[in-house]
Amino acid sequence: MADRGCPLEAAPLPAEVRESLAELELELSEGDITQKGYEKKRAKLLARYIPLIQGIDPSLQAENRIPGPSQTTAAAPKQQKSRPTASRDERFRSDVHTEAVQAALAKYKERKMPMPSKRRSVLVHSSVETYTPPDTSSASEDEGSLRRPGRLTSTPLQSHSSVEPWLDRVIQGSSTSSSASSTSSHPGGRPTTAPSAAATPGAAATTALAGLEAHTHIDLHSAPPDVTTGLVEHSYFERPQVASVRSVPRGCSGSMLETADGVPVNSRVSSKIQQLLNTLKRPKRPPLKEFFVDDFEELLEVQQPDPNQPKPEGSETSVLRGEPLTAGVPRPPSLLATLQRWGTTQPKSPCLTALDTTGKAVYTLTYGKLWSRSLKLAYTLLNKLTSKNEPLLKPGDRVALVFPNSDPVMFMVAFYGCLLAELVPVPIEVPLTRKDAGSQQVGFLLGSCGVFLALTTDACQKGLPKAQTGEVAAFKGWPPLSWLVIDGKHLAKPPKDWHPLAQDTGTGTAYIEYKTSKEGSTVGVTVSHASLLAQCRALTQACGYSEAETLTNVLDFKRDAGLWHGVLTSVMNRMHVVSVPYALMKANPLSWIQKVCFYKARAALVKSRDMHWSLLAQRGQRDVSLSSLRMLIVADGANPWSISSCDAFLNVFQSRGLRPEVICPCASSPEALTVAIRRPPDLGGPPPRKAVLSMNGLSYGVIRVDTEEKLSVLTVQDVGQVMPGANVCVVKLEGTPYLCKTDEVGEICVSSSATGTAYYGLLGITKNVFEAVPVTTGGAPIFDRPFTRTGLLGFIGPDNLVFIVGKLDGLMVTGVRRHNADDVVATALAVEPMKFVYRGRIAVFSVTVLHDDRIVLVAEQRPDASEEDSFQWMSRVLQAIDSIHQVGVYCLALVPANTLPKAPLGGIHISETKQRFLEGTLHPCNVLMCPHTCVTNLPKPRQKQPEVGPASMIVGNLVAGKRIAQASGRELAHLEDSDQARKFLFLADVLQWRAHTTPDHPLFLLLNAKGTVTSTATCVQLHKRAERVAAALMEKGRLSVGDHVALVYPPGVDLIAAFYGCLYCGCVPVTVRPPHPQNLGTTLPTVKMIVEVSKSACVLTTQAVTRLLRSKEAAAAVDIRTWPTILDTDDIPKKKIASVFRPPSPDVLAYLDFSVSTTGILAGVKMSHAATSALCRSIKLQCELYPSRQIAICLDPYCGLGFALWCLCSVYSGHQSVLVPPLELESNVSLWLSAVSQYKARVTFCSYSVMEMCTKGLGAQTGVLRMKGVNLSCVRTCMVVAEERPRIALTQSFSKLFKDLGLPARAVSTTFGCRVNVAICLQGTAGPDPTTVYVDMRALRHDRVRLVERGSPHSLPLMESGKILPGVKVIIAHTETKGPLGDSHLGEIWVSSPHNATGYYTVYGEEALHADHFSARLSFGDTQTIWARTGYLGFLRRTELTDASGGRHDALYVVGSLDETLELRGMRYHPIDIETSVIRAHRSIAECAVFTWTNLLVVVVELDGLEQDALDLVALVTNVVLEEHYLVVGVVVIVDPGVIPINSRGEKQRMHLRDGFLADQLDPIYVAYNM
């Protein structure tokens, strides 16, 4: 233990002083005395010896395990820091490592890092059970074995001999004697000829540590959790229909932080984001190549190796041969022959003693009983189980053995019974529930092995989960099984002359042992009869087993060393095995030592966990003696962290008769069985060794002995020599199995007759593992027989001893470096281990995100841990891992105590934990993601190249044979001269004409929630109501021509009458959505703003709304004294007006159309009379609207196309409109569809909100609707009115769902309009169906269109937005050069049409909107036409389809609004694409919205599930955005359903959401700031 650097090591201390010190250590460790008390007592004990100790050179420490005469047998413990409480969670622990971690942490400056915000309800998230019996669980599948008992590691003197001189020889190879001498004169020095990079690992590490201060500085004392409660009350169901405009404060003080658009921010949120930004501004670790390029500057490339990384320099290794198997004593030809021999010649000899949970021996199985009962079982299996007079089982069939860990006797009988019957036993764990951790994979194993029968005991079967029939339940993923109980009374006695035919010497399968891989898949390793026999013989020779010896077995007897030693080899040697069950170990950790003492056992089989547990429980047990032991086999010696348990155990129990040479670590793997085992000196074993290795070197697969730099080292002990008769070599991990160099870590491979032979039934993966052919550098095979890969990583050291530094299953490869999961666990536990992690339960694994392994650490926190503790611990763990391993942790999650899935005999079920993490069912209570520091292989930020000029672009397109992207709707017939055109120029004239010619023709029908007609309007009724409104405006309102009037009405006929009333008296109407009574605070300011901004001289409304506008509640939201005149039109007198106002010119303003954009900008556009009638005419032609038609409209009537369809089109075309207010659907979802069916509407319009409501609300009710007679076969076109990219998923699911009600598959389409032109595209009744194309989303980010096949990676479906309307011309122009673009090129959609709006009346929220929106000209080509810029990106594509006019059809595809796009890393992202990915990430995500804040991407998700599941989403959201969009999410905000504001068109108001977030008004469930 040279690395412990203990100054006390050379001083002889009397045994009683050593014992007192050990007890003192333990009292401190269990919290019985304080640190101060401990130091006082310790000083007193050591006072007499201190002078002897001072000044001894540590390099002179003795290094042999077997003490010579001059050496004493133990040393005093080192002084340690206090450990607050007693617990058994001290795993993976080592003093040196703990000190290293604390030293590393001390180097960090305290930096501010934002602490996650959590709602109080989420804080109350306690453990499943606050206390369970001690169960130290490890992150490895080795049942929690890996612990480094911390303060108990009093460094023993009989320390291992050092590996350093050997390694130096190895690396030098044939270096000269002078360099060798120079090396030997400096312990651990390097030859002068070695490259400088390798020569100074210490210096390099110091530099690295200095560099550490440049990043990951994390504040350990952040602000307390940000708990925001009750700020905004949102109903769970009703989404606030926010159309409110973002108010812009004027004249704010300069010091006040403002958002990009001037929203004042003084909240905690923004200060946290500031902290986060400050953290992120620090430089990242530089050496890794940060970016990559490909044809799209997009494919992630492998990171380039660091030129300074250590490289192996030794010579090539060779095959290491174990000693030959001794011929010696003649042995029986097979294990069954041996069993028969002992069963008949030594029937009374004890074979196996089973203990109960109190430690009492409940039954001793003799060899006679084992033989007779196994025979009985074999006979029963072969002769008494029949189906249809056929024997159920044939030789070679596989049979599952399901026995609890407490019943070794029945297991042994079953195992040998199967062997005698020539059946193949497949031992598995007892299933405890229907859905145990890993149950599905056990099912896969049973299925792949073709198992259909399971053997068990009566007691065990009673305890299995049952189905309602009383039968054993069907377990998740398992094949159908028959269960056979094999207790004595169920077995038949064989006739005297019956003998089994067992052939058990050849290559036939003897048994199958299960193995769970890193990814969680469970496979069966086939062990042949020959291998089984060879293994027993090799173990007998290596361990020197002899007849009638007693072995105490603490391991699981169903598999691994517990099976090989305790069930198989023991029988070969007629040994007596005392089996200690797991339950007894948990109740009394000293039980195995007591049994060793009681039975005078010569050998014991344990794991380091068992040694550690007994250390914690050994006080007061002075009467135990371990002097009978000649071998204490440590089965998990292959775990590098087992060394501490071994040393600490020896330190304490040496005084109780334990000899140092007795401790024998071994290494094994399911595929190769036992690989190596340390032999005691009397069996010819060399002295034990240990190596202190640089973790940095190991991460590059290179062995470097570390001397100076103790911060990141791994101390490993040898696992002895290879097995007798085996050949072992070390090969490279990836690619062809080339032999490693002597100073290189590789995978240990074994060639021997005693290994497994295959993965049962899985030929594909068998070949790679069981038939490896290692080759030399020159490519020549090294041996004539194939090797088996063990999955163990290590090297061959001095004296041909094997050293293991990790397992392939625990390997995480980040970039070019390799890290071992167990090492990371050890580092995390060294950070205040006792205080925080519940029973040391930590799982570390890697997940692949963006083509690289990312490290995830999950720990159980103590039930009493506060938020502050959690955050502080997480911060420190990140620093420690960064410092010790130089690697970032991608995600750190804390879960409540007792919630991680457990492996069968203790330990954490890693693969199940990983599965839950990826599925979002882990339910953490704290999460910290650090993608910014870990993800260094993002694509290169896009550098904008100087653009090609517009002229060159046109020429380029011509040369390429591409047409200019331009398209137009049908030509409008020249009706300007005719009567009708003049007559239809003004809508007021049209209404009067209709009232005169067809007075009783019904125009409007308004439905309520019950589907009954609440009001109607014929032509004459509407005319008369309009006259009354006009008279009231002129008389009561005293308005003059040209005044603006705000119409604040709920959807209905009153609104239409008020509109025409305004036209009749020459006023300009402005439709405004009335405020929501339950949500006045957010909706009333918008009303007030539109009234003020539109300069309305009067407000027309109903009595109910008038009361609302003047109410006390309204006064709290706005200044109600400043309303203009408010007129209610409920009871206005019947009056005529002298004459209807006729505008002097068609270009006079007809109405103002105000709308809030999704970016929160309130924009009003001017519509002239000419544009209004042109709009109506275009829609009439496209939809073939005549007076005989009925159309159903379920839209909000306040702006855009919704307003035009509700108020204008019926009057112009004369068709009847069935009006369905969308609000009514909240109380009757089927209202709209029932109306469509009832009125047999051929054409219907709705919004996305309506469509979504129907899809979600009526999904399960189509049958009920059909019975009510709802039939949608009348519909020819159902159009979604939208100002966005078509939502394909929604329209498709709507079509699919209502196909059952007769809705034609081709009926659903979308419209497209925007502020400059409310109706550009609309499907109509004629022409081809809308087409869908698939584009590459990555190309889209670079403003390019690349058409791909459906289903190809990164493909995005885009549906054509209906057909271009008559009279409308569209061209695609470059956003910056304003030049025309070619077919299928992405650019801004420009539109020219008689119904374009004539300009903005006003824009509020961003006054700098360009004046050229309505009067743009191309910079090249046709520079005369006046175009309006829509502000939307899209492309035109000529299809193969034929238009109504006979020409080829041009399809317009809308990609998204330019205002909404996010510019990140030089690329253009559309929020909807990121949101779609996020919504797909987890079933609990109901809705999602993204926005940026100071270059950080903020993702807000609505959680439709339990609050305690909220944190599952953080990692999934981060993963999916990285994977699919190559973006790092900065902040994840989890909110309640309905928090994301949505406008009447169903569009997300992302900027309102952003303002709400920054002003701390969202009342989030959780806010995670990704580091």
Curated annotation (Swiss-Prot):
One Gene Ontology biological process: negative regulation of gene expression
Enzyme Commission number, as recorded: 6.2.1.1
Q: Which GO terms describe its cellular component?
A: cell surface; dendritic spine; membrane; mitochondrion; plasma membrane
Q: Where is this motif: PXXP motif?
A: 283-286, 307-310
Task: Report if keyword ATP-binding is assigned.
Answer: no
Q: Does the keyword Magnesium apply?
A: no
Ordered alphabetically, the record's keywords are: Cell membrane, Cell projection, Developmental protein, Ligase, Membrane, Mitochondrion, Neurogenesis, Phosphoprotein, Synapse
Q: Where is the DMAP1-binding domain?
A: 9-127
Give the Phosphothreonine positions (modified residues). Answer: T132, T155
The record's account of tissue expression is:
Low expression in all tissues tested.
Phosphoserine-modified residues are: S94
Topology with regard to the membrane? Answer: Peripheral membrane protein
Annotated signal peptide: none
Q: Which domain of life is it from?
A: Eukaryota
Its annotated compartments are: Cell membrane; Mitochondrion; Cell projection, Dendritic spine
Subunit info here reads:
Interacts with FSTL1; DIP2A may act as a cell surface receptor for FSTL1. Interacts (via N-terminus) with CTTN (via SH3 domain); the interaction promotes acetylation of CTTN and is required for proper synaptic transmission. Interacts with SHANK3.
- What family does the entry list? Belongs to the DIP2 family.
> What is the name of the protein in this document?
Disco-interacting protein 2 homolog A
Organism source for this protein? Answer: Homo sapiens
